[in-house]
Amino acid sequence: MANIKSAIKRIDVTKLETARNKSKKSAIKTFIKKFEAAIEKNDKEDATKLFNLATKKIDQAASKNTISKNSAAKKISRMAKELNKLA
């Protein structure tokens, strides 16, 4: 356990940031799963709507460094490819 006051504060901040990042990553995974389910059903309208929502969440996470920009680009690219196959 840390003895220095600033180290104790950093531990608390890290716990908060970790929880926040886990929540954001979980939300991204949920949107991607919903998008994939819409793709399986061949529902282009729903898939497009979910693609836009997922893209927004992924970009927000990338801008806050929750996930890397390359990881975000890869996720969006894969989803766009699946959406274009549906057309």
UniProtKB/Swiss-Prot annotation:
Top-level taxon: Bacteria
Gene3D superfamilies: Ribosomal protein S20
InterPro entries: Ribosomal_bS20, Ribosomal_bS20_sf
Tagged with keyword Repeat: no
Alphabetically ordered keywords of this record: Ribonucleoprotein, Ribosomal protein, RNA-binding, rRNA-binding
Keyword Ribonucleoprotein assigned: yes
Annotated GO biological process: translation
GO molecular function: small ribosomal subunit rRNA binding; structural constituent of ribosome
Entry's Gene Ontology cellular component terms: cytosol; small ribosomal subunit
Pfam family, one: Ribosomal_S20p
Function: Binds directly to 16S ribosomal RNA.
Similarity remark: Belongs to the bacterial ribosomal protein bS20 family.
HAMAP family the UniProt entry points to: Ribosomal_bS20
Name of the protein in question: Small ribosomal subunit protein bS20
Source organism (scientific name): Finegoldia magna (strain ATCC 29328 / DSM 20472 / WAL 2508)
Gene designation per UniProt: rpsT
